[in-house]
A protein has these predicted regions:
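Short coil-to-helix segment of the ABC ATPase nucleotide-binding domain corresponding to the Q-loop/switch region
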Residues: 2-9
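Conserved ABC ATPase signature
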Residues: 40-50
Length: 144
C-alpha cells in the first residue's frame, strides 16, 4: 500500500516524470497533508483520503480538471482551502475546472454555474453569489 505522498505523485511516476517540488509543496499545504505524507490509507480519515485524491488530481497540472464534489467529506476550513486551490488553478495556472457540486458555497467560486434538472440544462449563468444560487435551487425544486 502506498503512503499518502507516494499516492499523490503516482500519476507522475506512471509517466516517468518528477514532481516540481514547489508545486508539490503548494498542493500538499493547500490540502493540509504536510504532517500525514508518510501515512498509509488505513491510517488516514475519510476526509484525509479525499484530500489525497484532490492533491493527486492537481499534481500533474492538467489543462482540464474534473472535480466531483471536491469538498464533500471535508470540514469547512479544509474545503475552503481546496476551493481556493481550485480557483488559483484557474486564475494563476490557466487550468479549466469543471466541478459538480450540491454546495452553493463551492458553486459560488465558479465563473459559470449550470443548473441541471431531470437531465436537462435549466439555467446557465455567469458568476453567481451563494444567495442567488440558493434562490435558484429553491425555484427549481419539484413540488412534493
Amino acid at each position: 500500500t502506498l503512503t499518502a505522498d507516494e499516492n499523490i505523485v503516482l500519476p507522475l511516476s506512471l509517466t516517468r516524470r518528477t514532481a516540481n517540488e514547489a508545486w508539490r509543496r503548494t498542493v500538499v499545504e493547500a490540502v493540509g497533508l504536510q504532517d500525514r505524507l508518510t501515512h498509509r490509507p488505513a491510517e488516514l480519515s475519510g476526509g484525509q483520503q479525499q484530500r489525497v485524491a484532490v492533491a493527486r488530481a492537481l499534481i500533474t497540472r492538467p489543462a482540464v480538471l474534473f472535480a466531483d464534489e471536491p469538498t464533500g467529506n471535508l470540514d469547512s476550513h479544509t474545503g475552503g482551502e481546496v476551493l481556493d486551490l481550485l480557483r488559483r488553478s484557474v486564475d494563476e495556472f490557466g487550468q479549466t475546472v469543471i466541478m459538480v457540486t450540491h454546495d452553493a458555497n463551492a458553486a459560488s467560486i465558479a465563473d459559470r454555474v449550470v443548473f441541471l434538472k431531470d437531465g436537462r440544462i435549466e439555467l446557465d449563468e455567469d458568476r453567481m453569489t451563494r444567495d442567488a444560487i440558493y434562490d435558484t435551487i429553491k425555484g427549481l425544486e419539484v413540488p412534493r
